[in-house]
């Protein structure tokens, strides 16, 4: 921070100032102005059938295209988790009718700007800063949601207006939401510009019948066209009015699950100009601050001469924090946060740190190599259409020595079932994981060359390993 006082953010002067010297964590809320000016505090998952327009809706609201990778653009599908932040504003002129008084903009927009609607006066003022988690297909979505790699507060369920409802995946998404215990849902009837009014009304009745008796019963159904940005302000209004501000824990020791990591150095960079690795993730609890000493577990994993797993946690320091393009002095739960560290960049390149947990030194949970879980299996495989042969889609019981894929936090690792009885199972993990008793994990099995979600479990206890520490 050249030329300025330390502890005061200099980037984006048009946003609210953050000062570490005066920060009182106990007074922060998910609506504190100095927080939502720069970062999102509410996470909303977008759920829906493939090609029903999830990414387009996110783009219409936030102006951010969540499809970032070349192979995703070519196939027009989302493969990695996409995050996009949006600020939602409300006009402070009471004469302006709803829903026109709501507006959404990208996360670097100033917190107040004058109205441009003819016949109204006053300013648009920031009321919410939300983060959309645009999940690839439902299997990954369910695993992501289940193991809590991101705290989800609400969901947008997308249904395309030009197809009949429900599509096979849609019922799974509802199952996913039920498993997740997500209470707040908005149903968006998209592509309304492609159908006649009678068709839209007919589908509206189909949707009503479909959600009856599920968690989504009573959820508002909003007709929109994401491409034409039609009715997007209604979605903004409902996000403000229908999704309550979630309770957040700002006072605990901070903990972040890494879902992305990268080396930001360009090839041929001078040694003196090298920057440390960057880890990205969603903070589950606590507040991370610039200058804070951090620990990353399990850290560097290796095997000793006897083939036993060893872990060496990485210790480092936070040099920068950012949310999309906004610099932060401190970061609170919600949204995707980038953490610039002094970690060797080669350890971070190309998502190498995914699955690790970052937090305050000495406050992170144990590292497990074996887990004992109480598990719950789904009755049938999701998303497998079975005609005739009904047996194929039934989920078979866990068998001893089979290899499952286990999702814990953001880590996907293999796990061999070493013992199983009734609803308890023991799993030996291929990679060690930093987690704690009581955490939820997702279980997937290989079915016809694909990993399919077959159930979830909760950690009862397990075998932990002591991290090794350098003597120097």
UniProtKB/Swiss-Prot annotation:
Pfam families xrefs: eIF2_C, GTP_EFTU, GTP_EFTU_D2
Region of interest called G1, as start-end residue ranges on this chain: 48-55
The keyword Protein biosynthesis is assigned to this record: yes
Protein's name according to its UniProt entry: Eukaryotic translation initiation factor 2 subunit 3
EC numbers, comma separated: 3.6.5.3
Molecular function, one GO term: methionyl-initiator methionine tRNA binding
Interacts with CDC123 as annotated region, ranges: 457-469
GO biological process, one term: cytoplasmic translational initiation
Subunit text: Eukaryotic translation initiation factor 2 eIF2 is a heterotrimeric complex composed of an alpha (EIF2S1), a beta (EIF2S2) and a gamma (EIF2S3) chain. eIF2 is member of the 43S pre-initiation complex (43S PIC). Interacts (via C-terminus) with CDC123; the interaction is direct.
Keyword annotations from UniProtKB, A to Z: Acetylation, Cytoplasm, GTP-binding, Hydrolase, Initiation factor, Nucleotide-binding, Phosphoprotein, Protein biosynthesis
Region (G4): 190-193
Similarity comment: Belongs to the TRAFAC class translation factor GTPase superfamily. Classic translation factor GTPase family. EIF2G subfamily.
Modified residues (Phosphoserine): 16
Purpose of the protein: Member of the eIF2 complex that functions in the early steps of protein synthesis by forming a ternary complex with GTP and initiator tRNA. This complex binds to a 40S ribosomal subunit, followed by mRNA binding to form the 43S pre-initiation complex (43S PIC). Junction of the 60S ribosomal subunit to form the 80S initiation complex is preceded by hydrolysis of the GTP bound to eIF2 and release of an eIF2-GDP binary complex. In order for eIF2 to recycle and catalyze another round of initiation, the GDP bound to eIF2 must exchange with GTP by way of a reaction catalyzed by eIF-2B.
Catalytically driven reaction(s): GTP + H2O = GDP + phosphate + H(+)
Region annotation (G2) ranges: 76-80
Cellular component terms per the entry's GO annotation: cytosol; eukaryotic translation initiation factor 2 complex
Segments of this protein annotated with the region G5: 225-227
Localisation: Cytoplasm, Cytosol
Modified residues (N-acetylalanine): 2
InterPro entries reported in the protein's UniProt record: EFTu-like_2 (IPR004161), eIF2G (IPR050543), eIF2g_C (IPR015256), eIF2g_dom_2 (IPR044127), eIF2g_GTP-bd (IPR044128), P-loop_NTPase (IPR027417), T_Tr_GTP-bd_dom (IPR000795), Transl_B-barrel_sf (IPR009000)
Signal sequence region: none
Residue numbers binding GTP: 51-56, 190-193, 225-227
Domain tr-type G span(s) in chain numbering: 39-248
